[in-house]
Amino acid sequence: MQPMHIVQLANFYGPRSGGLRTAVDQLGAGYVDRGHAVTLVVAGRAHDDEVLDSGVRRITVPGRKFFKVEGYRAASPVLIRRLLPRLGADSLEVSDRLTLRGMGPWAKAHGIGSIMISHERLDRMIELGAPRRVATWASDVANLGTARSYDTVVCTTAFAGEEFARVQAPNVETVPLGVDLGTFRPDRATPQARERWSHGADVLLVQSCRLSMEKHPARGIEIVRALVADGVRARLVIAGDGAMTDELRRQAYGLPVVFTGHLADRDDLADLLAAADVAICPGPHETFGLSAMEALASGTPIVVSRNSALADVTRDGCGLPAADTGAAFTAAVRAVLDGDYRRAARTCAEQYTWDRAVETMLGLHRATADRRRFLRDRPAGGRAAVAPARSSGAWSTQRAV
């Protein structure tokens, strides 16, 4: 099979980007391992051009700081459009629904395949600052435009795809991401790791997430406050950084809560997750929940928001869902501590492999690249062998933006 050149585009890619960065890096490395060329274009402080250990060429384009936390930068689409013709891509893989949404039409105009990976629920994000009715309307208009602009839209779970199903987008594929089963393992739960992170506490809780509003990061503090009030010798380790760090430290004052900041060392994070009794995953908008999957791979059960994609994962007996209140999460944590959930945790995580995700994504890239190449190279005025037209009914309800 002929090798492809896949160009990945990802603003907001940085050391603290969490699941997005992990997904982009794992997919890119998998493509290279299978003989394809990969160029990753990201935003940063200054221009850079380097080859990563994975074999991926990473080009950094100067970008402006987008959020309060360092590492979230966005490069101008104009700069990226100037760069793309020099790269010779067969297919684009875009991991940004906001600042790079115009890359799909650009790819079509240049005969290049295009895939957009939806890493979040747009309707949920808009709803953080707008009434639900407004959020639904705005996301429907935007999602309709996105689906029309790209050859394929990839969602990581059925939950993530619900907002595209609502506008009847016909070009949506569900591709679950993977988890690093080699790094995150139950056998890391050694007495040394337990002592390091628990400091003698009877119950060790972990919460690994970005400390920003949409993640509901104060939930873990509410839980440990309730447990301590009932005489439980509990300790909470919060691994992550974000705009709410100072506020959360104030809330946790006087409680057995430790803030590690961003844990850049994956081995440290893996030891922590394996040593914990329960991983708290409070974000109600998670479309996949990579940090939760890393906890499960480590053999640690999870307590999750019943309004996120992770609620479906817990049906396999690896944890419990809870309503988005401190009391509900505390009750679920108590139930998990009293139950037998660890056995199912690793088994659940083993269903999600990067090999499977990479192979599925390569199939989509091949299909879109071949179709665009055919349309680009057919004789002028030729009409034969074009792809069947899609039903107009799915597109006609609203004008794309």
Label every PLM stretch briefly.
Residues 301-304:
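Short hydrophobic beta-strand element within catalytic cores of glycosyltransferases
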Residues 284:
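Aromatic "clamp/platform" in nucleotide-sugar-dependent glycosyltransferases that forms part
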Residues 262, 271-276:
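Short alpha-helical donor nucleotide-sugar binding micro-motif in glycosyltransferases
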Residues 246-263, 267:
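Nucleotide-activated donor-binding/catalytic signature segment of Leloir-type glycosyltransferases, i.e.
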Residues 159, 178:
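Carbohydrate-associated surface elements
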Residues 259, 316-327, 334-339:
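Conserved acidic donor-binding segment of nucleotide-sugar-dependent glycosyltransferases
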Residues 198-225:
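Conserved donor-binding/catalytic core segment of Leloir-type glycosyltransferases
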Residues 75, 113, 124-145, 149:
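Nucleotide-sugar donor phosphate/pyrophosphate-binding loop at the beta->alpha transition
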